[in-house]
Amino acid sequence: MAFQVKIHQIRAFVEVARQGSIRGASRMLNMSQPALSKSIQELEEGLAAQLFFRRSKGVTLTDAGESFYQHASLILEELRAAQEDIRQRQGQLAGQINIGMGASISRSLMPAVISRFHQQHPQVKVRIMEGQLVSMINELRQGELDFTINTYYQGPYDHEFTFEKLLEKQFAIFCRPGHPAIGARSIKQLLDYSWTMPTPHGSYYKQLSELLDDQAQTPQVGVVCETFSACISLVAKSDFLSKLPEEMGCDPLHGQGLVMLPVSEILPKAAYYLIQRRDSRQTPLTASLITQFRRECGYLQS
C-alpha cells in the first residue's frame, strides 16, 4: 500500500521548515520535541527522502525538502482558504485575507479601500505585504498571498498567474530642494549625477531600464534600494536623483518636499495589475475586497 501523507505531518514539516529548528516548531505547534521529531521521521521514511539537513544549530531543507515545501505550504493555505470559504458561505463572515501591493498602491489606493472594508467587516483580519512583484512571487505560488496589485512587464509568470490591468500611474524624476540639477531639461543633462533606484528586478523599473538603454540615456545607479521609503529618504537628504511615481514624489507626507524635474522626455506610465494564481478560488470576502479595489481604481481613473 502506498504511503499516505497525513495532514499533521504536513503541518509539522512546514513549521519546522519555517522555524529552522525542531525546538522552535514545537513551541509554535504546542507539541513535544520527541513527538515532532517522530512525525518528521515518519514523513521522511514514508517518502523515502531526506527532507532536512540536521545541524547543531538547527535544520535546513534539502533539495527534496525545498520541493516538498512548495507543495506542502500550498496545501495548508488551500485548506485554510477552503475552510474559510465554507464558513463565509454559511454566513460566518470572518477569517484572514493576505494581500500584496506596490508602494504606490499602498499609499494611494489602499487606505480608502481597506478602511471601508474594515468598517464593513471588522472581524476580518487583513495582512498587507508591500513590495515589488518579484519579492512576492513565492508567497503567491504557495497561497500565502491571496492576490497582489503591482506592476508587471514581460516576465516568465504568464502561465502561473492571471493579470487584470487596473490602472496606470505616471512616473517622474525627483531631487531635493536646492539640488544643482534643478533647471535641467533633459535626461542627458542628468546622467553625470548620482542616482538611486528601487531594485531593477522590479517590473516597471526593468521596462524603464530597457527603454533608456535603447535611447543611450541610462543613468549610473550607484545605490539600489529595496524599498521606496529608503529611496525617497536618500533623495530628500542627499544629491541623489531618482525616478518615482509622481504622486509619491509630490506628496508632502511621503515625498519629504522633493522637487520634480521637468525634463522634456516623458517617462512611460506604469501599468498596475490585479495578479492572482490561475488555479486560485477566492473566498466570498476576498472576492468582495477585490471588487472594491476595482471600483476604487475606476474612480481614480475617471
Curated annotation (Swiss-Prot):
Coiled coil ranges: none
Presence of keyword Transcription regulation: yes
InterPro entries given in the database record: HTH-type_LysR_regulators, LysR_subst-bd, TdcA/AbgR_PBP2, Tscrpt_reg_HTH_LysR, WH-like_DNA-bd_sf, WH_DNA-bd_sf
UniProtKB keywords: DNA-binding, Transcription, Transcription regulation
Disrupted gene: phenotype observed: Cells lacking this gene may lead to an altered expression of abgT.
Residues of the HTH lysR-type domain: 5-62
SUPFAM superfamilies linked: Periplasmic binding protein-like II, Winged helix' DNA-binding domain
One GO MF term: transcription cis-regulatory region binding
DNA-binding region(s), residue ranges: 22-41
One GO term of the biological process aspect: regulation of DNA-templated transcription
Highest taxon listed in the record's lineage: Bacteria
Function: Could be the regulator of the abg operon.
Family: Belongs to the LysR transcriptional regulatory family.
PANTHER family in UniProt: HTH-TYPE TRANSCRIPTIONAL REGULATOR YBHD, NITROGEN ASSIMILATION TRANSCRIPTIONAL ACTIVATOR-RELATED
Name recorded for this polypeptide: HTH-type transcriptional regulator AbgR
